[in-house]
């Protein structure tokens, strides 16, 4: 659908417009712009996959410079792990509208063009995003497919249970020494855990970006690696964290803030969590984006010392239902006809026969009677295997047309572990 708004134009940015693009986004998100962040953006942003709306009317624009956007969005080309392994995903980011131009339909227009182009060019079958506000993206067909737990652990009130034996050694090392271990462990984990993203090119630099202005009085990032043998041996777990020392009248009240913990073995999880919880001078260990099944809650002797707050994290949009459903595997054999409603992307409306198992899947349009009726947003929520179709049906978001079809399909969509996305993009 062409963008036809008097005085406004929508187009991808040019490479030399990136500083203004980045400054605009930071301003909308209530932050200042920093040169080091713009330099990182130069390595991450693909100008051809951006969209910006420019006010050319001379009225209402934030400044006289017409190269400053009034609305923006972009796509990062990433790999998303789904049940069965990684697939290409359009990682939607930088969605912003200037306060001078809100409530004018600019967000909907950008979402429309973005999804139309993905479909028309047969690019990624799946789009993903983190929602700044959870009420925004459902109307564009996104569903909340992952949840994360905010953890606040009173570390003096609990410890890893004594029956969990410890082997190997945890070492704290500089970033350059830790890097190969972090990369190796993460690659093992991300291929197996739905919701994880690849970190090719500059994405490790983005994940470990640690400017002084972000630290809020805490230390620089520190790196702990668990080695299965001596420090020169391979690693199977790591923690990336910062520390902030504070004292009150009773003594030290330091805080460990976790950026990321990954473990490819149970022994690694035991060792790295014991290290974090037993740190001297620390009263709390906090993590904003832990997996909902993070092992620490099962390892400690006093789980009530862990305060957990569950929040939505990764949202999934099936751009092309047939291609997306065929791109993952299924935990149990499935043969079901799904009737899909999609008010925003009419090409998805219809019935599809999905057949598949743990080795692969096929999904094709059909005229057969539907076994299930579901919205594209509900399918997005179920896509990574963390939200069951039966739970969505209990909320009225899935309708069973053939008895038994719901239970069978729900079992097939299931993932052995809930999906987790450890990084915001």
Which positions does each model-derived feature cover?
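Intrinsically disordered, low-complexity, positively biased terminal segments
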Residues: 1-18, 30, 163-425
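A conserved beta-turn-beta hairpin within the catalytic core of GNAT-like acetyltransferases
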Residues: 80-92, 102, 246-255
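GNAT/GCN5-related N-acetyltransferase fold signature
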Residues: 53, 75, 97, 226, ...
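Conserved acetyl-CoA-binding loop-helix of GNAT-fold acetyltransferases
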Residues: 92-116, 120, 265-277
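Conserved GNAT acetyl-CoA-binding A-motif
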Residues: 111, 116-131, 280-291
